[in-house]
Structure formats: structure tokens, C-alpha cells
Curated annotation (Swiss-Prot):
Gene this protein is translated from: sat
EC number of the protein: 2.7.7.4
GO molecular function, one term: sulfate adenylyltransferase (ATP) activity
The protein, known as: Sulfate adenylyltransferase
Main enzyme class: transferase
GO BP: hydrogen sulfide biosynthetic process; sulfate assimilation
Similarity annotation: Belongs to the sulfate adenylyltransferase family.
UniProt xrefs under HAMAP family: Sulf_adenylyltr
Pathway: Sulfur metabolism; hydrogen sulfide biosynthesis; sulfite from sulfate: step 1/3
Keywords: ATP-binding, Nucleotide-binding, Nucleotidyltransferase, Transferase
Length: 379
């Protein structure tokens, strides 16, 4: 791998834009989450995918965590429909996809439609078929058929406060090059920055050029932080605590799957497509509850030596009152009683009570944004 010019996953950055006339086509409605992923396919964030998975690729992803041709891919990107709708779309061939507002999204070139076992598929992707798992629950609620085929993007959503920070891989690669970065570390997040996260990011760029903070914007589980809160907190943190030209912020518009180890690989692939040479993989990356071993997302990278991006594995960071620094269990001999750390539940309880946590947990500027927001959490 050439760190200064990392290849997209699969060797080619996909770009699929529609230049024809879509008027008069059959139409099909898709969710906002699926509309976001269609845009991700079109822009190459999901390279090498050019559309929704066909049956051979879908089954290969479930069984092997790879596409049918052997290319690493761990999360199925699919379009579900009921039997009648799937048959109609397949018969039409080219179908105009519309989001819930009726806006044009893309043309789907439908190639096949096929059934799938939702419970078995969920067990493969999530390592469990427990309906209490948010990803499993989502898959079990899907319709019974899948439609495979390439897509071509017709139109994009209007710019919003959140979308102003969305960037395509072409844009991020240009931005990194313009900054003079040859090594770029990706930081995946679905939370506002704890000071420990900030220190972890800064540790990772001590010997690298810059960090790309890339929060997930899209559907998450109840109790997670709202998208606008996460973005505003990061903007404030970068403004006050980062040297110039060492950190860039860009939003990734997709939903959290909570697929643990498989999603860690997916996160790495997307960030490689953005042009990142490294990705931070923390404890229980993309996990939820107690479904995954805390370091399973580290070990899974052993099964994917062909990825171009390099994972940086970190245990949990915390502030130690004895060490007088931010550290981790590998470097600190002191017990839990000396550590400034807080669980997600305890942090949410504090915020709901209108109280700010210790400055060793959240920067004052970050805490203020959260406390002043009328609805910092997803209902």
C-alpha cells in the first residue's frame, strides 16, 4: 500500500450519475435511509458496489463476509420489497426511486429479485437473531424479497445544516491532498467528543499527518445523541483544541447497523474510499449492549489482510488522577478508583438532570452545547 495515495477498495472509485430522461418511468418508493445509501453508492463511498446486491453477492456476504468475486464486504446493502412490488420492479427493468417526500433519487436498473431468510441473515450479520438487538430488529421488519441491480443517481437532497459537511470521496481526497496530508487517520463516531476521544485522536496523529473525524448521520437507536448535537460539539472542539490543519470534520450519511466486528470492517472500507490510510478501532467498536466481545472488532481484521486501510487498535482511554494524564489500562497501573470515566447511561442521566460532567470527561464548550440543546438525545 502506498500511504500517500491509497487506492479505493476494489481498485476503482465508483461514480454513478444519471444523464438520461427519467420521466415516464415506473416509480418505487424507498426510505430516507436507503436514499442516503443510494447516494453513497453513486459517490463511491461504498466502492466497489454499483448498486444493490444480487443474490450471489448477498449470499457470499452472509456466508463469507466477501462478495462473490472474493472482494471484502461485510454488510449487505439491499433493497427490500414485498412480493408484488419486487415482481413489478423486475418486470419494469428501469425504475425511478423516490424518497418519502416524493423527490427523485435514482434510477434502479433492476436485474433480479429473490427471497431471503430474514432470521438467518440477521444471525450471520449480527452474530445473533435476538430481536432486542436494534440491527436484528431492523432486519426482521424488512419485506420478504430483495431486488438487485445497479443504480444511477438522478438528484440530491437540498443542502441543510447537517448536509453542508457531507463530502464525497473525490472531495475528501482533494481536501487531504490540499492539506499536504500523506497519512490520514479516520475516526468513526456516533457521539459528541469526550476528552478521552480527543486525546486518542491526538495520540494517533503524533506520527501521522491529520485526522478525519467522520460522524455517522442517520438512523440510530433511541438514547443516542442527536446528529446536530454531535456535529456542533465537534466543530467547537476542533475550533478550540486542535492545531490548524490537523483535523477535518465531515459527516457520513448512513445508518448505524450495530453489527460490531462486521461493521468495523465496513467502516474501514468506507474510510479507505475517502482516502484515509488508517482508522482508529476502539473497544467494542460499533457494538451495542453486551452482544460482542469488546475486542472482537480488533481480531476480525486478521481475516482481512487484503484491506488497504490500516487499523489502529486502542483500548479505552481515561484520565488517571495518580498518573496526572490521559492513559489506558496498558500504561496505567492504578485501579478504577483513580480513573475519571463515565458510562453512557450515567452521562445521559447527568445531562437530563442539567448537570455537566467533570472537565476530564467533557470539555466545557462541549458540555454547554449539549446542556443548552432542548433535545440532545434521540427519542
Amino acid at each position: 500500500m502506498s500511504e500517500g495515495n491509497i487506492e479505493p477498495h476494489g481498485g476503482r472509485l465508483i461514480s454513478r450519475l444519471y444523464s438520461g430522461d427519467a420521466s415516464g418511468m415506473e416509480k418505487a418508493a424507498i426510505s430516507q435511509e436507503l436514499a442516503s445509501d443510494v447516494e453513497n453508492i453513486a459517490d463511491g463511498i461504498f466502492s466497489p458496489l454499483e448498486g444493490f446486491l444480487g443474490r450471489n453477492d448477498f449470499e457470499a456476504v452472509l456466508e463469507k463476509g466477501r462478495l462473490a468475486d472474493g472482494t471484502a464486504w461485510t454488510i449487505p446493502i439491499v433493497f427490500d420489497a414485498d412480493a408484488a412490488e419486487a415482481a413489478r420492479i423486475k418486470a419494469a427493468g428501469d425504475v425511478l426511486l423516490e424518497d418519502p417526500s416524493g423527490s427523485k433519487v435514482a434510477v434502479l436498473h433492476a436485474e433480479e429479485e429473490y427471497p431471503f431468510d430474514k432470521k438467518a441473515a440477521a444471525a450471520r450479520v449480527y452474530g445473533t437473531d435476538d430481536a432486542a438487538h436494534p440491527g436484528v430488529s431492523r432486519m426482521l421488519s424488512m419485506k420478504e424479497r430483495l431486488v438487485g441491480g445497479r443504480i444511477d443517481l438522478v438528484d440530491r437532497p437540498e443542502k441543510t445544516e447537517i448536509r453542508r459537511l457531507r463530502m464525497s470521496p473525490v472531495e475528501t481526497r482533494h481536501a487531504f491532498a490540499e492539506s499536504g496530508w500523506k497519512t490520514t487517520v479516520a475516526f468513526q463516531t456516533r457521539n459528541p467528543p469526550h476528552v478521552a476521544h480527543e486525546m486518542l485522536q491526538k495520540t494517533s496523529i503524533t506520527t501521522r499527518d491529520g485526522v478525519f473525524v467522520n460522524p455517522i448521520v442517520g438512523r440510530k437507536k433511541p438514547g443516542d445523541f442527536a446528529d446536530e448535537v454531535i456535529v456542533k460539539c465537534y466543530e467547537e472542539m476542533i475550533k478550540h483544541y486542535y492545531p490548524e490543519n490537523r483535523c477535518r470534520l465531515g459527516t457520513l450519511h448512513t445508518e448505524m447497523r450495530y453489527a460490531g466486528p462486521r461493521e468495523a470492517i465496513h467502516h474501514g472500507i468506507m474510510r479507505q474510499n475517502y482516502g484515509c490510510t488508517h482508522i482508529i478501532i476502539g473497544r467494542d467498536h460499533a457494538g451495542v449492549g453486551k452482544y460482542y466481545d469488546p475486542f472482537a472488532a480488533h481480531r476480525i481484521f486478521d481475516d482481512y489482510p487484503d484491506l488497504g486501510i490500516t487499523p489502529i487498535f486502542f483500548p479505552a482511554f481515561f484520565y488517571c488522577r495518580k498518573c496526572l494524564t490521559y492513559t489506558n489500562p496498558k500504561a496505567c497501573p492504578h485501579g478504577e478508583g483513580e480513573r475519571e470515566q463515565i458510562s453512557g447511561t450515567a452521562l445521559r442521566d447527568l445531562i437530563r438532570a442539567g448537570k455537566a460532567p467533570s472537565e476530564y470527561i467533557l470539555r466545557p464548550e462541549v458540555a454547554r452545547i449539549i446542556l443548552e440543546h432542548p433535545r440532545p438525545f434521540i427519542d
